[in-house]
Amino acid sequence: MAPKRKASVQTEGSKKRRQGTEEEDSFRSTAEALRAAPADNRVIRVDPSCPFSRNPGIQVHEDYDCTLNQTNIGNNNNKFYIIQLLEEGSRFFCWNRWGRVGEVGQSKMNHFTCLEDAKKDFKKKFWEKTKNKWEERDRFVAQPNKYTLIEVQGEAESQEAVVKALSPQVYSGPVRTVVKPCSLDPATQNLITNIFSKEMFKNAMTLMNLDVKKMPLGKLTKQQIARGFEALEALEEAMKNPTGDGQSLEELSSCFYTVIPHNFGRSRPPPINSPDVLQAKKDMLLVLADIELAQTLQAAPGEEEEKVEEVPHPLDRDYQLLRCQLQLLDSGESEYKAIQTYLKQTGNSYRCPDLRHVWKVNREGEGDRFQAHSKLGNRRLLWHGTNVAVVAAILTSGLRIMPHSGGRVGKGIYFASENSKSAGYVTTMHCGGHQVGYMFLGEVALGKEHHITIDDPSLKSPPSGFDSVIARGQTEPDPAQDIELELDGQPVVVPQGPPVQCPSFKSSSFSQSEYLIYKESQCRLRYLLEIHL
């Protein structure tokens, strides 16, 4: 084997230490976090399909607003019902709209001159559809063959302020505020625009058959997503331990589609009746939770702008919300060239991704957490592909243990030494006539490797005495061409050669190697790549 060539690269770790390295399964820990989250503040809007929605004098009375949903796979039901009590001066209206999920549906407007009469009409309709009292909605209990209350949240007022801030000068009463010029370079400005794009989030939801009309961005609450996790947990338990007297998978699937509305058009909603379908819905909810996280970041209140003369540019504000330093690399730097070679040599041989930009990543607190493994050797720079909709969440929260209960190598964080393997997990967005995607390169402290050549989805940790699990593939980048980058004083192997056959693993069930760690702290994100596919 040729000696490894070294290139020295130094990065600064964060000075804030994050305590603890115990990792939990992401699915259950995410569900618990959502359940424990405080209720979101609601800003209630008039239903956009209501003819009064463009009348600024019409508003929803107090919190008399509800979105109901009902899915029954056996009867091919997948329907919604919206009720709002509207007011304008001394006039009151009870607005009802209903239909199949994904369609505008039918509507009805009742007029009242007495508020109490309007309230009675609202409460009566709520009772008819749910068999729950409006006054007891905080203790809502879903009833058979009735609608379920869906918790949604109006678009935050602060978001409107952010949009308005796009203009060079903003006046708020007698106080004049000026938006500062953006401090980010053009490539990073475009990155921040993309990973916080509402249109991108909506497209990601549409690809998952989620009803973006029922759950437009900014409206889905943490508590509602948590109910989706609970419904999937019930489905998983029913698959593992079927009983004759329990709910059927079809009934439990209907419960899931009721709390997380899906748009299937006029087609019958498909039952969640296999581990593969269940896993797809788990992954979907994790993406949904990450979308909610990105939206929560943007909706978080900043300083009161009316008290200052200058406000940050919206892109600077979003960048600061990530709590992550992104440094754009010049294409002439040694790091960039090494990454470019790594991509070209291990990318798809028919259509290799086109590298556009590379950012050095320094997540707040991650350097200190990674330091816990400073004595663990055998470090490699490895690929991780992802959905563009979760890039902001990853930059904020890092890579987390994914619930691969049906995964080939168990519950861990998956990496690859060949770009073409990880690129298969990249979901892109359309931007400027191109399909734009993002990939991460992480420094992974592998330590002592345990090799496998057949699937083992039961793995939750390496065997005793080992630090990682490698599903050895039939090919691997030519180790004779590996180089080393020095990152924070540690040598990190970076493949530079094309994939070659591995005679020792020619019978492996894995065509390409997969690298698994089971502690989130064993990885540090080092680079973010923008690619065109």
Swiss-Prot record:
Annotated GO CC locations: centriole; centrosome; cytoplasm; intercellular bridge; nuclear body; site of double-strand break
Protein name per Swiss-Prot or TrEMBL: Protein mono-ADP-ribosyltransferase PARP3
Function according to Swiss-Prot or TrEMBL: Mono-ADP-ribosyltransferase that mediates mono-ADP-ribosylation of target proteins and plays a key role in the response to DNA damage. Mediates mono-ADP-ribosylation of glutamate, aspartate or lysine residues on target proteins. In contrast to PARP1 and PARP2, it is not able to mediate poly-ADP-ribosylation. Involved in DNA repair by mediating mono-ADP-ribosylation of a limited number of acceptor proteins involved in chromatin architecture and in DNA metabolism, such as histone H2B, XRCC5 and XRCC6.
PROSITE patterns the record matches: PARP_ALPHA_HD, PARP_CATALYTIC, WGR
Entry PTM: Auto-ADP-ribosylated.
Annotated GO biological process: DNA ADP-ribosylation; double-strand break repair; double-strand break repair via nonhomologous end joining; negative regulation of isotype switching; positive regulation of double-strand break repair via nonhomologous end joining; protein auto-ADP-ribosylation; protein localization to site of double-strand break; regulation of mitotic spindle organization
Residue span of motif Nuclear localization signal: 14-18
Pfam families referenced in this protein's UniProt entry, alphabetically: PARP (PF00644), PARP_reg (PF02877), WGR (PF05406)
Family note: Belongs to the ARTD/PARP family.
Entry EC number(s): 2.4.2.-
Keywords attached to this entry: ADP-ribosylation, Chromosome, Cytoplasm, Cytoskeleton, DNA damage, DNA repair, Glycosyltransferase, NAD, Nucleotidyltransferase, Nucleus, Transferase
Domain (WGR): residue spans on this chain: 57-147
Domain PARP alpha-helical: residue ranges: 181-299
SMART domains: WGR
Enzymatic class: transferase
